[in-house]
Amino acid sequence: MHLEFSEQDLQFRNEVRAWIAEAFDPELRAMMAQSKNGYLDKAGQVRWQKALHARGWAAPNWPEAYGGPGWTPTQRHIFQSELAAAGCPPVSPMGLKMVAPVIMKYGTAAQKARFLPPILKSDVWWCQGYSEPNSGSDLASLQLRADLATDGDGAHYVLNGSKIWTTHAQWADWMFCLVRTSRDARRQEGISFVLLDMRTPGITVVALPTLDGPVPGQQEVNQVFFDNVRVPVENRIGEEGMGWTYAKYLLEFERGGTYGPTLSKQLAKVAAIAADQPGDDGRRLLEDAGFRRKLAQLHLRAAGLQAVELKLFSGVESGKSIGAASSMLKLLGTEAMQAISELAVEAAGPAALPFVQDTWAEIQGREASPRVGPDYAAVLAPRYFNYRKASIYGGSNEIQRNIIAKLMLGL
């Protein structure tokens, strides 16, 4: 395992830093400062991702054959670390990080030619159709029906049912979706993986309110209803009934990632808040030994996680697969995210309590009262509530513990 960067790696890091300093302009920085979930609205995301694409850096994990930069795992880690350290928005993962690898591995030549170029350019927005009202962690129980039919338009599936917790479905042009094409086989064997145009007749998207409040431009989750929605058979990825295999492959990309640098950036913000807040005795909160101990413990968790990430990426560079370790990264990373958001609210104290007041006032038809406290505190409560879901999406952390126990510990 090599934890020290080579001279070439350090030169690459400087190149990335110089580009970020120019491309991540004050307007984007201000938008990110008020983001409750770490992403921009659609217009902001598209603008950022097209800037990355213009530099050739929109898809660091893609092979060169499909338009990727051809980086080593270490370069990819450096790139993601520098973006996180600068507070840049991550790319929306649904297209570039999730469905694209599935299309590359299991799609036909025609599907690759049709879907991959617009994904790379961020010309087409994707959402994920996995969870259902009665199928979350037990995803194999999904029931969205896809009945095969043939008429003058050729062979197609007719979809009836719904998906839920569908992130940014209101923005999406396309959805990658798990559907049930058979009820006779084992649950996992009756699932297929299809791509569907969100403009198809019969699709209805309904926004779901969440605890973090109605922040303009930051609506996240939706329920999507399908009423006799026709999906051409040629939009199925791979073989019928093999969707579960493709979904498991995709989840490796959803669960894995670079958490350490992002957590360190969040902790630096917490320290800045604490340095600005007086404690009960009039001293700055950062001077309080108890608070500093909590902050130090989280710094150690972030540093430990980053060391694990570097070890895993070093293995990837030697030809090893991350495999079930992606569950470990997801578990440790999301729990640390939640703990940091809790400490940020604690640091800001009463200033963190009012949130999205202007929006609530507008909904209620009244004038907004002045917000108490510094500007940075306005987003702390929405972010705290938003991060409660981090231990659930992508497979709940309870499921991740089961995977770790079975595949890594042999229990």
Regions picked out by a protein language model, each given a short descriptive name:
Residues 272, 293-318, 334-347:
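Loop-to-helix element that buttresses phosphate recognition and phosphoryl-transfer chemistry
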Residues 46-123, 168-174, 302, 316-324, ...:
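Internal helix-loop-helix
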Residues 144-148:
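A structural signal for short hydrophobic beta-strand segments in well-ordered beta-sheet cores
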Residues 143, 155-206:
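A short core secondary-structure module
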Residues 22, 57, 69, 327-411:
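Alpha-helix capping/hinge segments and adjacent helical runs
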Residues 122-130:
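A short, Trp-centered hydrophobic/proline-enriched beta-strand micro-motif
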Residues 135-136, 164-169, 389-396:
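Glycine-rich phosphate/pyrophosphate-binding beta-alpha loops
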Residues 3-5, 204-305, 390, 406:
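Glycine-rich beta->alpha junctions and the first turn(s) of the following alpha-helix
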